[in-house]
Amino acid sequence: MKRLEDYRGIVSDEIIADLHRRASKLHDKHVVHMNSTAQGGGVAEMLYALVPLMNDVGVDAGWRVLVGSDDFFGITKKFHNGLQGDPVNLTDNKKRLYIQANESFSQYNHISKHDAVIIHDPQPLPIIRFYKKRQPWIWRCHIDLTAPDPGLWE
């Protein structure tokens, strides 16, 4: 597991000190990241490093991985491609399955003690609908949104 000190020599002592200084503003905060896979993707690789580094500088960070059926992940792959410009035809049934998977995930994934939620990519995006607490939510999109299929924004 990486620690910030492992980067000493790659980045300057001033940068490491600056990261600690900036993180001190969040020392009493709980942050949770949500994405759709624990392995095999760029977001997962990033979170494997980022979450321990956040904890190392004193930010209480966690990570939740969305659970869904093969059909759900097939639909979210269409979302992914559509957000990058491919034309997508999502039936009402596919939209319902997408929403239902997020609702189901929300029922056993308790985030009420977190001060901020960071959603990575579109798979868990509608999950905010199913929580009563309205702490800050951040959508960190890791895909190109230059020319998305306009129908996906509906």
Q: What function would you assign to each model-found segment?
A:
Residues M1-E154:
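Catalytic cores of nucleotide-sugar-dependent glycosyltransferases that transfer UDP/GDP/TDP-activated
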